[in-house]
């Protein structure tokens, strides 16, 4: 269910801005997106798992906050991460 260490390292290496970057907004958004996708699949099977649904809503809110921050600070980076992750239609 949760991200394995290997999956997390793969996401970090894909979205990091420099070699030691693990906490930039892009990396955090990418990790949250992967966790959200996994939890969404879980909830499709387990429709009555309301505790996990609450966690999902919390993660979506956190990702929204990070995206708003990035949009305010650097719009080009925001557009790049949204396009790369396919978040907007």
Curated annotation (Swiss-Prot):
The lineage of its organism: Bacteria, Bacillati, Bacillota, Clostridia, Thermoanaerobacterales. The keyword Flavoprotein does not apply. SMART domains: Ribosomal_S15. Belongs to the universal ribosomal protein uS15 family. GO terms for biological process: translation. The keyword Ribonucleoprotein applies. It comes from the Bacteria. It comes from Carboxydothermus hydrogenoformans (strain ATCC BAA-161 / DSM 6008 / Z-2901). This is Small ribosomal subunit protein uS15. GO terms for molecular function: rRNA binding; structural constituent of ribosome.
């Amino acid at each position: 269910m949760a991200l394995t260490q290997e999956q997390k390292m793969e996401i970090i290496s894909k979205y990091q801005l420099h070699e030691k970057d693990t906490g930039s907004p892009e990396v955090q958004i990418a990790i949250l997106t992967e966790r959200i996708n996994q939890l969404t699949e879980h909830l499709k099977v387990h429709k009555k798992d309301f505790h996990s649904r609450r966690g999902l809503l919390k993660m979506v809110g956190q990702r929204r906050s990070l995206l708003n921050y990035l949009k305010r600070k650097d719009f080009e980076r925001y557009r790049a991460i949204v396009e790369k992750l396919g978040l907007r239609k």
